[in-house]
Amino acid sequence: RLTINLDMNHVDLERNNGLTIYGNSPKDTKIVRGIAAKFSDVHTDLSSKYSVNVNEIPSTAMPYNSDHAPFVYEIDNQPDDGMEYGKALVCYGSGSSEYHTYLDTMDRFNEESLAVSGIILGSFIRYLSYGERV
């Protein structure tokens, strides 16, 4: 149903404090946007420190530069009858710029920032599993 890519999702506070979550399903991004708003209300300590942007983009604009790409672009075995795209949510943090460079070391890693995407997307996964039950 959905691929969630949490690769390179930590924040480098020397660069900025942002996380970006984007996806190609209007329904999914709307739900995640609502979860992110609730996250800001409940986890004020983290939300005051880290900003979260949730964006919806068309399937044809999904980047083909990370692990989620085959699950978006390569699920249709017969594209001649009209391309069918897979759904994906992707989270990148400002720390992703160091990926595979000399700065990609654990001393620059910000484990606290992983809680932000973990709580938001973990809540979404729970929603997919159980619905709106409390």
Predicted segment positions?
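His/Asp/Glu-rich mid-to-C-terminal helical/loop segments that flank catalytic regions of hydrolases
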Residues: 95-134
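Metal-dependent peptidase/peptidase-like ectodomains
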Residues: 1-90
